[in-house]
Amino acid sequence: MTKFKHLLALAALLLAAGAAQAERLKDIASIQGVRTNQLIGYGLVVGLSGSGDQTTQTPFTLQTFNNMLAQFGIKVPANVGNVQLKNVAAVSVHADLPPFAKPGQPIDVTVSSIGNAKSLRGGSLLMTPLKGIDGQVYAVAQGNLVVGGFDAEGRDGSKITVNVPSAGRIPAGATVERAVPSGFDQGNSLTLNLNRPDFTTAKRIVDRINELLGPGVAHAVDGGSVRVSAPLDPNQRVDYLSILENLDVQPGEAVAKVIINSRTGTIVIGQNVKVSPAAVTHGSLTVSITEDPIVSQPGAFSNGQTAVVPRSRVNAEEETKPMFKFGPGTTLDDIVRAVNQVGAAPSDLMAILEALKQAGALQADLIVI
């Protein structure tokens, strides 16, 4: 224990003295087992101003409402006709349970309509248990919703909707009831998982930790994980990780990628994208058809009839654009400059990049989303 205390003190001094233009370890890696868990539940939102579910179309809302009343000893007679609960909506409730969350701590929840409720604005969520993937209840949610959107409709059928009124949030709307075991304090080692697996980054993390704490403290498991020795005492382990997560590590260069969103026309070109020698030209053919009818007017007293003679004009024009050439080692700046010079639109640039990839001149992964 004393050895680890001395080692941590020395590491803190070396860490404070070193200066590097790099990323913190906490920003490029996470600790295995320390993670967020998703919770989900089903409940009712009440207090809506006539914008709730139409129970004739969403029978599960009425069933849920009757089940809730039964828990309070209230039984709805079976001979009652269709009950219209315009102020009630069936909703799904989900939340993220952060690591190390303890019973009694509040967490935010998101509430979304399941039925055909027009708006959840002004509603209150009744007590809803939130379960994990194992079926255990980890939190209980309840409270007033904060809805950013709104919906308004006139008698003549005119309607306006701003944002999404059928979903909202409850800040600190759930209370944690059960903690999730993390395994953080078990074993004599910890595993760091890289957010973006890379062999170069993994090697640099190992070298940086061993340089600071001594050889053999860290070793790479693969391109996405690094295992480090850790003290058994929980207090020392926290001190140990507080030093590791603030280490400066220079990540490896990302794989060259070009991302194309064909729906929005967005194109993102990575910094390391290069193009082999190639010549590119991209023209467009425009075909226009115009109707120019001629009116035939007969002479006076000729007993003729006025007639319209159709006449169509078809014109084809091909826009010529200069050819631009990519030399060896062309970078992102060169590509952007060349494309701007010819005035290519996003759709034109997509076609050019796809053609360069097919020709084997684009040295990058082309990803269409």
From Swiss-Prot:
It is found in: Periplasm; Bacterial flagellum basal body. The keyword Signal applies. Its main location: periplasm. One of its GO terms (molecular function) is structural molecule activity. Assembles around the rod to form the L-ring and probably protects the motor/basal body from shearing forces during rotation. Belongs to the FlgI family. The basal body constitutes a major portion of the flagellar organelle and consists of four rings (L,P,S, and M) mounted on a central rod. This is Flagellar P-ring protein. It comes from Pseudomonas aeruginosa (strain ATCC 15692 / DSM 22644 / CIP 104116 / JCM 14847 / LMG 12228 / 1C / PRS 101 / PAO1). The gene is flgI.
